[in-house]
Amino acid sequence: RKLGYLDGCRKFGIKVAEEQKIDCFMSVGGGSEAAEQLMAQSELPEALFTTNDAIALGIMRKLQEKKVAVPEQISILSYGGNEWNEWVTPSLTTLRLPIEEMSSACVQLLNTMLTTGEWIPISRIFQLELEYRESCTKTEK
């Protein structure tokens, strides 16, 4: 996810400063700790992109505690598509993973491997769906 994000940024000429790449546990607590690191920097970025919804929730909670307004001061977008994304305040913008399609592809691949006895390396790209909600502002860029 991270590599795909950075590759996309390069393709569109978006520079991501090294200090803006924050690694954390993939949990609400990890997101809270990442928000602390982010706020220790001299300036907040215009937007954040997290590798899962739990991290985004932790960041949003910590920012709200510190009176940083989402999306007025910073927009947040995540990977995932958890059902609670529409119930948090502000509701979370996310790239929904096609879990059913991904699961089906895994089962089919496993079945083929068990049937043939062959290991089949595979690379597959799945289409994501943007669920635009309140955590992001639209820009004119």
What is the meaning of each model-derived region?
Residues R1-K141:
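Bacterial carbohydrate/catabolite-sensing allosteric modules
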